[in-house]
């Protein structure tokens, strides 16, 4: 059973070079796609597909996709498979397609259940949010440091920046723009610190 699909895939790869062929260029492809939408599986190919007779031969040779090498491939396939086997092959493909469509339906049900779960969790989080402070306020409260620790960190930062300023003044000069920029930054930190200390 696994050999048949591999033969079909080999033959379909041989046909891919033709620019003029249509999407439904193969009788087997037409049979498979039409039987998926038909209630009766034993309809003759001539009733289902235009351009084919009762035996599955192409009636219209004017399509331009039939080539001399192609005829030998089709004849080899027809010689190796009887019409009953073709029907069995179509039934196997139909079953495979039904299985994959059922998997798709199951996947849709899974996504629907996930959406429902997300809705219920978001509703419960809305109920919790009514009783809790705003998220931004909560994040600010969590990131706020105690005042003595903040003062300690500011003192260490000012000490490090002052040492860097001295090395800049000695290394690159007092008139360099990086030295002036660092000096302005340190003065700004000192002003903010003094304002906060005088307010408290």
Curated annotation (Swiss-Prot):
One GO cellular component, as annotated: CatSper complex
Record keywords, A-Z: Cell membrane, Cell projection, Cilium, Differentiation, Flagellum, Membrane, Spermatogenesis
This protein's record includes keyword Signal: no
GO terms for biological process, alphabetical: flagellated sperm motility; male meiotic nuclear division; sperm capacitation; spermatogenesis
Localization terms from the record: Cell projection, Cilium, Flagellum membrane
Basic and acidic residues: compositionally biased ranges: 1-29
KW Ribosomal protein (keyword) present: no
Chief site of localization: membrane
Chain positions covered by the region annotation Disordered: 1-31, 58-78
Membrane topology classification: Peripheral membrane protein
Entries under InterPro entries matching the protein: CATSPERZ (IPR039019)
Described purpose of this protein according to its UniProt entry: Auxiliary component of the CatSper complex, a complex involved in sperm cell hyperactivation. Sperm cell hyperactivation is needed for sperm motility which is essential late in the preparation of sperm for fertilization. Required for a distribution of the CatSper complex in linear quadrilateral nanodomains along the flagellum, maximizing fertilization inside the mammalian female reproductive tract. Together with EFCAB9, associates with the CatSper channel pore and is required for the two-row structure of each single CatSper channel.
Subunit structure: Component of the CatSper complex or CatSpermasome composed of the core pore-forming members CATSPER1, CATSPER2, CATSPER3 and CATSPER4 as well as auxiliary members CATSPERB, CATSPERG, CATSPERD, CATSPERE, CATSPERZ, C2CD6/CATSPERT, TMEM249, TMEM262 and EFCAB9. HSPA1 may be an additional auxiliary complex member. The core complex members CATSPER1, CATSPER2, CATSPER3 and CATSPER4 form a heterotetrameric channel.
PANTHER family: CATION CHANNEL SPERM-ASSOCIATED AUXILIARY SUBUNIT ZETA (PTHR42155:SF1), CATION CHANNEL SPERM-ASSOCIATED PROTEIN SUBUNIT ZETA (PTHR42155)
Name of the protein in question: Cation channel sperm-associated auxiliary subunit zeta
Source organism of the structure: Homo sapiens (Human)
Gene that specifies this protein: CATSPERZ
């Amino acid at each position: 059973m696994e050999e048949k699909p591999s033969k079909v895939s080999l033959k379909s790869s041989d046909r891919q070079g033709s620019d003029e062929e249509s999407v439904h260029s193969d009788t087997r492809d037409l049979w498979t796609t039409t039987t998926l939408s038909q209630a009766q599986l034993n309809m003759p190919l001539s009733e289902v597909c235009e351009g084919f007779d009762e035996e599955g031969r192409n009636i219209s040779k004017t399509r331009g996709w039939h080539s001399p090498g192609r005829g030998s491939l089709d004849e080899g396939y027809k010689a190796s498979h009887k019409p009953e086997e073709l029907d069995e092959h179509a039934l196997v493909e139909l079953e495979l397609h039904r299985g994959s469509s059922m998997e798709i339906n199951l996947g849709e049900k899974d996504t629907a259940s996930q959406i429902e779960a997300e809705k219920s969790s978001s509703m419960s989080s809305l109920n919790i949010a009514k009783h809790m402070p705003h998220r931004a306020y909560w994040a600010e409260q969590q990131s706020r440091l105690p005042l003595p620790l903040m003062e300690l960190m500011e003192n260490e930062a000012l000490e490090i920046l002052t040492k860097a300023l001295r090395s800049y003044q000695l290394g690159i000069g007092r008139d360099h723009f990086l030295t002036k920029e660092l000096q302005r930054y340190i003065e700004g930190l000192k002003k903010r610190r003094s304002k906060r200390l005088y307010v408290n």
